[in-house]
């Protein structure tokens, strides 16, 4: 059972809204992008995307359904000959709404609605290129981590011999100090014996 859309109708009446949306869709397909108020752009988006879906199918019945809404035959031809085949591999999301600054006179919120012209399907070469780039970044990170670990081990090894050399020097000085008094005492004892012998 068909139910009316919620909220106020654009233009006041149902017939005015359908005419307004048809004119906006005609301008969108003719120029590729239009600037309008944000509520009109939001209402136009599903309307235009359904027409593009009809154009993708391309049958005579679909063309007649579109002709009920868009009266300009040149725009319908453009829709079926150029726009529909362009979106053959894309499932929805044919339009984009971009908010712009408010209108100067009445401060109405404005938006630009445009057909999305960028290709979304990436070929195998692009996928391979992206995978190789991400792999290269991962390898660089791994190399950096390995370099950091190597530097840490080098610092530890340089610190360890320095500590050992300071410990060895301290031990040598302790040994020299203990050996020096012992040698002096033995020399003094020998001298005293020599003096005793001479007497």
Swiss-Prot record:
* A cellular-component GO term for this protein: cytosolic large ribosomal subunit
Per the UniProt record, one Pfam family is Ribosomal_L17
Taxonomic superkingdom: Bacteria
Q: Where is the composition biased (Basic and acidic residues)?
A: 137-152
Acidic residues bias: start-end ranges = 153-199
Keywords of the record, alphabetical order, are: Ribonucleoprotein, Ribosomal protein
The region called Disordered is annotated at 123-199
Cysteine pairings via disulfide bonds: none
Q: Which NCBIfam families match?
A: L17
The annotated subunit structure for this chain is: Part of the 50S ribosomal subunit. Contacts protein L32.
Into which family does the record put it? Belongs to the bacterial ribosomal protein bL17 family.
Query: What is this protein's name?
Result: Large ribosomal subunit protein bL17
* UniProt lineage: Bacteria, Bacillati, Actinomycetota, Actinomycetes, Mycobacteriales
């Amino acid at each position: 059972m068909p139910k009316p859309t919620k909220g106020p109708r654009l233009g006041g009446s149902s017939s005015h809204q359908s005419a307004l949306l048809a004119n906006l869709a005609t301008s969108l397909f003719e120029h590729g992008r239009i600037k309008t108020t944000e509520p009109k752009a939001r209402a136009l988006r599903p309307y235009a995307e359904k027409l593009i879906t009809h154009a993708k199918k391309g049958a005579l019945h679909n063309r007649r359904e579109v002709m009920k809404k868009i009266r300009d035959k040149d725009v319908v031809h453009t829709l079926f000959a150029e726009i529909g085949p362009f979106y053959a591999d894309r499932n929805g999301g044919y339009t984009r709404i971009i908010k712009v600054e408010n209108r100067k006179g009445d401060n109405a919120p404005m938006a630009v609605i445009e057909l999305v012209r960028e290709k979304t399907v990436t070929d195998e070469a692009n996928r391979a290129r992206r995978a190789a780039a991400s792999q290269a970044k991962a390898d660089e990170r791994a190399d950096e981590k390995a370099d950091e670990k190597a530097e840490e081990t080098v610092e530890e090894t340089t610190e360890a011999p320095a500590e050992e050399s300071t410990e060895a020097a301290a031990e040598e000085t302790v040994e020299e100090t203990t050996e020096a008094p012992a040698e002096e005492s033995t020399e003094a004892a020998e001298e005293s014996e020599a003096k005793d012998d001479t007497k």
